[in-house]
């Protein structure tokens, strides 16, 4: 383990940001000891903060990033680099994209630097059994070693699961759970924890809304459930909330409303995997809880940032 006094956090952030303006794909190879420091220090902060975060607006919320590091940099260029704005990320930082390491390292570095202004939740890909398969393990093994992947797993197992903004906006990676009756159930979950195959924690990271159903139904993913607009309305009414904000699904415009604007899906990886022609979006919540969207067009289109 590196002696933490030797590690220069500002230098790590500077090197990660140095590639702004370089050709997308240029890598930043931090020292293994520096990455271990990021994982260990961030883990301490996650554990010291609640598993169900209670946050205040104004805040900017981002959905899946999936290793698209240069798009993450574009999001910050658009929304303001921390601490210019407060941020909440909804999970899925690793896998599928080419630069999971830079992506997660910058997010962890900002978490350590600005622990009260920068927040990241756990996605279903911040789980060893998933990121072992979809790219992160291979990237760690290729660029560093398997032991480092295990260090990330220890860190991911301590990430918070959900956040409530000003008691009115409920955010998580996936969606609601048929097992969720009270917020206290989330608060009681002990960390470190893996993501189980079923139950509350699994659903919060895996479930999806479905406009064509009533109640709960099985999910095509083979994990968790889907839930209808009636479930969303009942939940918000019961908990006196206004909006559910989640990620987990690619949506064409980067954001998509559901159930009469009672739920919004955010996806922040434009041109996802190079296979989709989707935009990416970031949701800005102002002090009065008014939500607006900032759109990142797919980079390929050679357009600067569009707004809508």
From Swiss-Prot:
One Pfam match, given by its short name, reads: STPPase_N
Q: Which UniProt keywords apply?
A: Cytoplasm, Hydrolase, Manganese, Metal-binding, Protein phosphatase
Q: How is the cofactor bound, as the UniProt entry phrases it? A: Binds 2 manganese ions per subunit.
Assigned GO CC terms? cell cortex of growing cell tip; cell cortex of non-growing cell tip; cell division site; CENP-A containing chromatin; cytoplasm; DPS complex; mRNA cleavage and polyadenylation specificity factor complex; nucleus
GO BP term, pick one: attachment of spindle microtubules to kinetochore
Q: Which SMART domains match?
A: PP2Ac
Asked whether the UniProt record includes Hydrolase among its keywords, one would answer: yes
Catalytic activity from the UniProt record: O-phospho-L-seryl-[protein] + H2O = L-seryl-[protein] + phosphate; O-phospho-L-threonyl-[protein] + H2O = L-threonyl-[protein] + phosphate
Q: For binding Mn(2+) 2, which residues are annotated in this chain's numbering? A: 92, 124, 173, 248
Q: Which CDD domains match?
A: MPP_PP1_PPKL
One term of GO molecular function? protein serine/threonine phosphatase activity
Family matches, as InterPro entries: Calcineurin-like_PHP_ApaH (IPR004843), Metallo-depent_PP-like (IPR029052), PP1_catalytic_subunit (IPR050341), Ser/Thr-sp_prot-phosphatase (IPR006186), STPPase_N (IPR031675)
Entry's EC annotation = 3.1.3.16
Q: Which residues form the active site?
A: 125 (proton donor)
List cofactor names only: Mn(2+)
Recorded hits in PANTHER family, A to Z, give: SERINE/THREONINE PROTEIN PHOSPHATASE (PTHR11668), SERINE_THREONINE-PROTEIN PHOSPHATASE (PTHR11668:SF300)
Q: Which family does it belong to?
A: Belongs to the PPP phosphatase family. PP-1 subfamily.
Q: What is this protein called?
A: Serine/threonine-protein phosphatase PP1
